[in-house]
Amino acid sequence: MTSPFLQRHLGPSETEQHQMLQTLGYQHLDDFIKDVVPDDILDAAPPRNVLPAGCGEAEALADLGTIAAKNLVQRSLIGLGYHGTATPALIQRHVFENPAWYTAYTPYQAEIAQGRLEALLNFQTLISELTGLPIANASLLDEATAAAEAMGLSFGVCRRPEANRFLVDCHVLPQTWAVLQTRAEPLGIELERVDPEQMAFDTRVFGVLLQLPGADGLLWDPTTLIERAHDAGALVTVAIDPLAQTLFAPVADFGADIAVGSAQRFGVPMGFGGPHAAFFATREAYKRQIPGRLVGESKDAEGNPALRLALQTREQHIRRDKATSNICTAQVLLAVIASFYAVHHGPDGLRAIAERLVGLRLQFEAGLRTLDVAVEEADRFDTVTVTTTHAPAVHAAAAEAGFNLRVLPDGVPASQATGFGVSFDEFSDQKEVAHLLEAVARAVGKPVSTAPASAANTALLSLPSRIRPWLTQPAFHRYRSETELMRYIQRLVSRDLSLVHGMIPLGSCTMKLNAAAELLPVSWPEFARLHPFAPLDQALGYRHLADDLERWLAALTGFAAVSLQPNAGSQGEYAGLLVIRAWHRSRGDNHRDICLIPTSAHGTNPASAVMAGLKVVAVACDAEGNIDQDDLAARATEYADRLAALMVTYPSTHGVFETGIRHICEVVHRHGGQVYLDGANLNAQVGLSRPGAFGADVCHLNLHKTFCIPHGGGGPGVGPIGVAAHLAPFLPGHPFENQTASAIGPVSAAALGSASILPISWMYLRMMGADALRQASAVALLSANYLAHRLDDHFPVLFRGATGRVAHECILDLRPLKRDAGIDVDDIAKRLMDYGFHAPTVSWPVAGTVMVEPTESESLSELDRFADALIAIRDEVRAIETGAMDALNNPLKRAPHTMAAVMAEVWDRPYSRQQAAFPLPDQTQNKVWPAVARIDNAFGDRNLICTCPSVEAVAIAA
């Protein structure tokens, strides 16, 4: 049965598909597919026996509603980095549920991403002001991996060859400790978990991680310890609670070199563990080592301020195995939400929330003492931890009253607890404190007493208070009313380009439809309000959802098992390589440490390999863009005794189905290695071929590409891995679940990673069904080949498969334009903005080219509109080649053209205003204006500004 959803997911209608096939010389889609996908990997049919039949959105939502109802939403006061938070309705409606925000891509084309970049600059400013550190990035994946990145930075900048010890506060969050263990071992880093008072330093210590407040809730002044660490040449990272940080002096004042944490409690629901925006702030000295994206200010060609991604040369897509991190996707959408939460509340509002939580904590402590429950006299923020013989009874009474408390020690059943912890959050109030005290009173057999009045003094005496003005920037004060904030959000939207405006043809990025029905369940409280460490029997709906997804994805990829834990494609790569490494070690092959990687590979591949403790050896590609099989055989033979893995992307990064993929896998296996397949291009394979069936041992999938989770302007993403049966025992574990002895440690803070967005992919697969998924892949291939055909006479297609066809994307060669007219790939990218399009992927995997991926969701009219735009641009280049247009002062070199420039009283350019801004007739009805003119990136990197201007700076500028 054809899925009723299919016609909504596909851009081209059946009639348009037939037209496209005829253009390419085919009558039937099946005949076309047989020409594109090699015979030895093409499946006769998709896995109908495992995947559900397709259905409409109402049926799928009803089915998912039944699953969601299995989740029991209790009041979780567990804490440990996850807290209840109230997302302002304005932000939920105008940001979280707004496709103009969630369908955009990473802001590489900054001139059409100024709105998102401003929201991210607000986020960086928020973090910088909270921490007192001048450089903050635009988000990381979660707090645990941010701490691991801090360990990596500290290790990387240390120049003492003997230094390999990293000291970790014994009060660090348990999931952070677990992820640190995973990260440290492959790099040869020795971890020592110790009470800060007992920390001893020698020349082997390169770094320290402190938690403030600690997992036990305690606050203390780390100044003396940090001075001792610095005297020993070690960097100090402090993991902070951003809400607590509103009350006391910035951690930079105590001497911290790096601050990390999670912005989850700034308006982002717990979501059973994610996604949430982590943050990373550091000193100016480490600006070129900071991981992740960094937004900075520069100027455009007209001299106006403009924002863009700064210092990109340190990132994995350029530095590869020498990169500071393998991070690619981060958590932009969640960082944007957190930034608007801060704009919504302002510094006074944030502080008021924090002070209220301290008051509730003091009130609860006082109530416990009236019940003769001993509470240590100490400064805390929002958390109380208690050791008592009544702990099992307290947990039972709290559960009966609808509360989940932290079970102490971590990881034991509540019936065996020796203590409990309570962390108050934004939903807490005095009534909740009273209910908790009633539960404790029942547990300890004391009469129920009236809760003490709210504490008047909320000072945190062990730490100096925050007294300097902070968040003085106008953005955090100007939008107090909902009307003003709504207009501000919309003003930023108008400065961006997303899928609501038109096709985003980025190669290797799969910017396909993110259907509203797929995203709707993410806001359901059954998914949004669960704590990741809640009792497992309260998350049966999530387990059902995960089981379905794991089973469906395994069937589609041909693997035996799937882990959904990795919360980005880069994390999937890393996890997959660790699984391979663990398998080799289980066989006594500890010496296998060589990872073969084609020279065309995405930069995350070598960066991930290095993080996994492997050494990268490059494999050449031939003139057709395929892996040079002779060179592969030579490298495999040369390193046969040490070969751990080959990392290969399929279809290749050059946009073709290589015919020798089975043979490539056989060569690697014959020499003792495993095959890691990068699933970035899986959108060309779903329902047509299965990596596990043609020789891959591991494959990561990008749910934010192939399976419809939106890109969010640069995250969130999900990067699960599928593995063959012999590798299944080594899939990532987690300390809060039953972790097997063979499992590698966790790669993400939560067991299910970014759990709350998994319903998106579940909905997509449920509505599509097996046959529709195969059809979608086929149409993705058809659309790419249609564009390749239309554009080939104007921009040669650089690589084609054995039958002359491309896969789901194609590379257009622009290098002759540079030679003949002085027009480079950036000129084309910027000129496309004037035509209303985001540029394709620029200068990757081949410099001077663009890589185009249309996906199956774009209509024939949109494909033609894009082709017409590129052909018109080619005509403009010809005018330069013939001398009809000036070589320097032309629409390409001056692109993009802003409304201000076009409407200026003086127009001194040798081409018309219409040619500048309305080069195609249909643009008079649908015009997207770049917010700024071409940005000077070099100027911005030389004059790095990564926070909003202060009131004083704004006043001076005015």
From Swiss-Prot:
Names of the cofactor(s): pyridoxal 5'-phosphate
Single Gene Ontology MF annotation: pyridoxal phosphate binding
Record keyword Ribonucleoprotein present: no
Top-level division of the source organism's lineage: Bacteria
InterPro entries registered for this protein in UniProt: GcvP, GDC-P_C, GDC-P_N, GDC_P, PyrdxlP-dep_Trfase, PyrdxlP-dep_Trfase_major, PyrdxlP-dep_Trfase_small
GO cellular component: cytosol; glycine cleavage complex
E.C. no: 1.4.4.2
GO BP annotations listed: glycine decarboxylation via glycine cleavage system
Catalytic activity annotation: N(6)-[(R)-lipoyl]-L-lysyl-[glycine-cleavage complex H protein] + glycine + H(+) = N(6)-[(R)-S(8)-aminomethyldihydrolipoyl]-L-lysyl-[glycine-cleavage complex H protein] + CO2
N6-(pyridoxal phosphate)lysine: modified positions: 705
UniProt keyword annotations, A-Z: Oxidoreductase, Pyridoxal phosphate
Pfam families membership: GcvP2_C (PF21478), GDC-P (PF02347)
Family label: Belongs to the GcvP family.
NCBIfam families (alphabetical): gcvP
UniProt function note: The glycine cleavage system catalyzes the degradation of glycine. The P protein binds the alpha-amino group of glycine through its pyridoxal phosphate cofactor; CO(2) is released and the remaining methylamine moiety is then transferred to the lipoamide cofactor of the H protein.
Quaternary structure note: The glycine cleavage system is composed of four proteins: P, T, L and H.
Protein name in UniProt: Glycine dehydrogenase (decarboxylating)
Organism field: Synechococcus sp. (strain CC9902)
Gene: gcvP
